[in-house]
């Protein structure tokens, strides 16, 4: 199980500049990812989502999401007590 689903999310978390991610989004997403990685219960992930996380419909395995800002979302799976396959997505 990989903590990150793609290179963009890994770069953002590790502070590597990406032209396709605004700096303010990258900073906020990195903080949220840190919270997701530290979570030991799914309920802990609500802190990253400013009190809200949502289960995405029709996903297998179940996938959850929390808003980073505007059209930017973090999606992740919850498996064996931790967030995995975390991905920063631009839905715009």
Give the predicted meaning of each segment:
Residues 40-65:
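A short, surface-exposed loop/turn module that caps and links secondary-structure elements
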Residues 57, 64-92:
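Enriched for short, Lys/Arg-rich terminal
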């Amino acid at each position: 199980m990989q903590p990150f689903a793609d290179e963009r999310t890994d770069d953002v978390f590790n502070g590597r500049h990406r032209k396709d991610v605004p700096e303010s989004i990258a900073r906020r997403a990195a903080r949220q990812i840190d919270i997701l990685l530290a979570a030991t219960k799914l309920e802990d992930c609500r802190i990253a989502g400013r009190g809200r996380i949502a289960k995405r419909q029709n996903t297998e395995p179940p996938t959850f999401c929390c808003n980073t800002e505007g059209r930017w979302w973090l999606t992740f799976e919850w498996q064996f007590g931790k967030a995995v396959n975390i991905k920063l997505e631009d839905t715009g």
